[in-house]
Amino acid sequence: MNKLSTKLVVAIGIGAALYGILGLWGFSIAPNTFIKPALAILTVFGALFGPVAGLLIGLIGHTVTDTIAGWGIWWGWVISSGIIGFSMGLIQKRVGFSVKNGSFNKGDISYLAITGLVGIVIAIIFAGAFDIIVMGEPFDKIVIQVLGATISDVIVFLVLGLPLTIGLAKSNKKHTHLKIEK
């Protein structure tokens, strides 16, 4: 089994703390469903540190949010945050992609967009199914939650997460078009 480096463990801790605390902030769009800008943390940290970090940041961070909020831990939604973080981190495995070094191309951005969107849809459907099957929640309520959560997460991903990740990568680019005059 691969060991987690100290740097990765620290990144997971910081990412989970940020995701957990920022997850308390948002505004309601459906029963128990909020637009939460914290999802952008999963995008950025996943792209920086990979799928394992994204998974753990999502799992730990969402558990922190639910614990602090006091509404109990909703494990289906905790797992869904882990799935989303994992999917955001898949981009880090692409050869030539690095947010840290500012190396990316349009194909990388498309890949992140697709894996992010697919991950969000799979994760939210999982959470809804979990709530119906395991938690005994009413189907009608869950349909509204799943639709609301999917729409809000897609919006946050496309409006905040993706642009922040691209902006961070651009700011880390090693070369410029500036020339030294002699």
From Swiss-Prot:
InterPro entries: ECF_substrate-spec-like, UPF0397. Keywords: Cell membrane, Membrane, Transmembrane, Transmembrane helix. Its main location: membrane. GO terms for cellular component: plasma membrane. It is a multi-pass membrane protein. It comes from the Bacteria. It holds the Pfam family ECF-ribofla_trS. NCBIfam families: PRK13661.1 (NF010182). This is UPF0397 protein BCB4264_A2665.
